Swiss-Prot record:
Annotated catalysed reactions: a quinone + NADH + 5 H(+)(in) = a quinol + NAD(+) + 4 H(+)(out)
Annotated InterPro entries: NADH_Q_OxRdtase_suD, NADH_UbQ_OxRdtase_49kDa_CS, NDH1_su_D/H, NiFe-Hase_large
Principal localisation: membrane
Family the UniProt entry places it in: Belongs to the complex I 49 kDa subunit family.
UniProt protein name: NADH-quinone oxidoreductase subunit D
Record flagged with keyword NAD: yes
Organism classification: Bacteria, Pseudomonadati, Pseudomonadota, Alphaproteobacteria, Rickettsiales
Subunit structure: NDH-1 is composed of 14 different subunits. Subunits NuoB, C, D, E, F, and G constitute the peripheral sector of the complex.
Key word Iron-sulfur present: no
GO cellular component: plasma membrane
GO molecular function annotations of the record: NAD binding; NADH:ubiquinone reductase (non-electrogenic) activity; quinone binding
Membrane topology (UniProt): Peripheral membrane protein
Organism, as annotated: Rickettsia felis (strain ATCC VR-1525 / URRWXCal2) (Rickettsia azadi)
Function field: NDH-1 shuttles electrons from NADH, via FMN and iron-sulfur (Fe-S) centers, to quinones in the respiratory chain. The immediate electron acceptor for the enzyme in this species is believed to be ubiquinone. Couples the redox reaction to proton translocation (for every two electrons transferred, four hydrogen ions are translocated across the cytoplasmic membrane), and thus conserves the redox energy in a proton gradient.
Xref: Pfam families: Complex1_49kDa
């Protein structure tokens, strides 16, 4: 008696809400079990790297907000660090603390969306509603500091665009006081929930060796038990002055990755608290007039200041020839920017390293042997956003 099995090919996406963007996933299935998962990317490709070659260094910043549009300021941070490395310019301490403060608010912004939408994919509606209420408060902080809720365009090579408005630090302080109890409420719903654990525990297991071999970073790497965090291993701005822990998992499954993200939010709260306590007075931009535009007050008094402002924003500033690679610990993993300058006001080459790109490549081996329903859980726990993958 012969046992002939016939596999079926299933198209998941690119319109399916559980694909978190424009993922087209071709699944080869034996009944309900996944044999192969082939992700098709490129549906959100906009040629960002090529566009940046035709823009000045200041005009390039808004493009980084539109990569991982869930955590925009972390992308800006990497680009600002790369340009500063080529310029060899000093960043005022107040600006460094503001950057770290908003990078950690961005981490909370990212993880609240990820955990909320992951719970929704599995069938739990309440966490999404509660967490979106908290995200709204952070988006208001974004709006108050930059004028925009999502695409902030706030970080600059040499500092930040504007100083914090009056009362903002006090409001952020109030937010981080009331936020931990909300996280405890989410944990009380999910951590020991029988259905949640059945859907996450031992699903999508990634060993330490696999995580290293595939170039994973962020919660995907730390969930497998590897304590690698660029804020600790290669600190930038004032992270070396701040005390925090790097949460890690044990088993490398979906539950561990969820838990790592949960613990990271508590650590972000600690970092934000320290930033508020240590925030110095002073300038928020470098004092080099070639990089920093004149103030509005000066422009109203001086025609030269007006001309300087116009030329800075139309022609930009020249960056010395050279190359650099700078990476930040973005919420999804290591987000890196490689810049190559031949001198002049535009980069010759800008290469963007997106953490989600490596994570999506691993989807095939992670989902092999799992059920179709588990693939939805795995996609959610990868935390992929196609703005940064397709670029």
């Amino acid at each position: 008696m012969t046992n002939n099995t016939k596999t079926i090919t299933l198209n998941l996406g690119p319109q399916h809400p559980a694909t978190h963007g424009v993922l087209r996933l071709i699944l080869e299935m034996d009944g309900e079990v996944v044999n192969n998962a082939d992700p098709h990317i490129g549906l959100l490709h906009r040629g960002t790297e090529k566009l940046i070659e035709h823009k000045t260094y200041l005009q390039a910043i808004p493009y980084f907000d539109r990569l991982d549009y869930v955590s925009p300021m972390c992308q800006e941070h990497a680009f600002a660090l790369a340009v500063e490395s080529l310029l060899e310019c000093e960043v005022p301490r107040r600006a460094q603390f503001i950057r770290v403060l908003f990078s950690e608010l961005t981490r909370i912004l990212n993880h609240t969306l990820n955990i909320g939408s992951q719970a929704l994919d599995i069938g739990a509606t309440t966490p999404l509603l509660w967490l979106f209420e908290e995200r709204e408060k952070i988006m208001e902080f974004y709006e108050r500091v930059s004028g925009s809720r999502m695409h902030s365009n706030y970080f600059r090579p040499g500092g930040v665009a504007e100083d914090l408005p009056d009362g903002l630090l006090e409001d952020i302080d109030k937010f981080i006081e009331q936020f931990p109890p909300k996280l405890h409420d989410i944990e009380s719903l999910l951590n020991e929930n029988r259905l949640w654990k059945q859907r996450l525990v031992d699903i999508g297991v990634v060993s330490q060796k696999e995580a290293m071999d595939w170039g994973f970073s962020g919660p995907m790497l730390r969930g497998s038990g590897i304590a690698w965090d660029l804020r600790k291993s290669n600190p930038y701005d004032v992270y070396d002055e701040i005390d925090f822990k790097v949460p890690i998992g044990k088993n490398g499954d979906c539950y561990d990755r969820y838990f790592v993200r949960m613990l990271e939010m508590y650590e972000s709260i600690k970092i934000i608290k320290q930033c508020i306590e240590k925030m110095p007075k002073g300038a928020v931009k470098t004092d080099d007039p070639k990089l920093t535009p004149p103030t509005r007050a000066k422009m109203k008094e001086s025609m030269e200041a007006m001309i300087h402002h116009f030329k800075l924003y139309t022609e930009g500033y020249d960056v010395p020839a050279g190359e650099t690679y700078k990476a930040v610990e973005a919420p999804k993993g290591e987000f890196g920017v490689y810049l190559y300058s031949q001198g002049g006001n535009r980069p010759y080459r800008c290469r963007i390293k997106a953490p989600g790109f490596a994570h999506l490549q691993g989807l095939d081996f992670i989902s092999k042997g799992h059920l179709m329903a588990d693939v939805i859980t795995i996609i959610a726990t990868l935390d992929i956003v196609f703005g940064e993958i397709d670029r």
